[in-house]
């Protein structure tokens, strides 16, 4: 159970960097687990900013890479681009500070999260999300204790999630096969 929670936290953190979403869709009791920098980014979005993010998210398959997506964002809004780059740099700095095993693990989570996005902008496939989480859990369990501890220290929101009994129950229910 402990491992599932850590992984869901990491997935959540990386998904925030990968898939634009609205903070208003997150239940209040879970918002405290979103890193402050991510909350601030979404809190400061204007209606126009949200529309730009939705538009670009629906076209994500047309971008060769993250830099191409950021260039498209810059063409739409310099201010939104600046804020997105600031958030990206924050997350990138955390990832870059990790030792090789932890960094590789987080990079794999990001790649897995990106692979879950629908090319046509439709809803994410819940079964694919569950399978991705199971795959990541298996990889996490194979990590050394030192690497697991480094992940907890680098991503402190995880520590809050680990101790939350309601989230533990929800994670267990969500990851059941059917």
From Swiss-Prot:
Signal peptide: 1-16
Principal location: secreted
PTM comment: Not glycosylated.
Source species, domain of life: Eukaryota
Keyword Secreted: yes
GO terms for MF: fatty acid binding; retinal binding; retinol binding
UniProt subcellular location: Secreted
Any GO CC annotation of this UniProt entry: extracellular region
KW Secreted (keyword) present: yes
Keywords tagged on the record: Coiled coil, Lipid-binding, Retinol-binding, Secreted, Signal, Vitamin A
Role played: Binds retinol and different fatty acids.
Protein name: Fatty-acid and retinol-binding protein 1
Organism: Wuchereria bancrofti
Lineage, top ranks: Eukaryota, Metazoa, Ecdysozoa, Nematoda, Chromadorea
């Amino acid at each position: 159970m402990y491992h599932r929670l850590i992984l869901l936290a990491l997935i959540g953190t990386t998904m925030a960097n990968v898939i634009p979403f609205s903070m208003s869709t997150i239940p209040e009791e879970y918002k405290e687990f979103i890193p402050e920098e991510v909350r601030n980014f979404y809190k400061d979005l204007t209606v126009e900013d949200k529309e730009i993010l939705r538009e670009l998210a629906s076209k994500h398959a047309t971008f060769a890479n993250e830099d191409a997506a950021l260039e498209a964002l810059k063409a739409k809004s310099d201010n939104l681009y600046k804020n997105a780059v600031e958030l990206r740099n924050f997350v990138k700095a955390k990832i870059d500070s990790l030792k090789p095993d932890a960094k590789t693990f987080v990079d794999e989570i990001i790649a897995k999260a990106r692979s879950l996005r629908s090319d046509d902008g439709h809803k994410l496939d819940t079964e694919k999300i569950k399978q991705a989480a199971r795959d990541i859990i298996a990889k996490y369990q194979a990590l050394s204790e030192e690497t697991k501890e480094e992940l907890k220290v680098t991503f402190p929101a995880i520590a809050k999630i680990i101790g939350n009994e309601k989230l533990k129950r929800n994670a267990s229910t969500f990851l059941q096969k059917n």
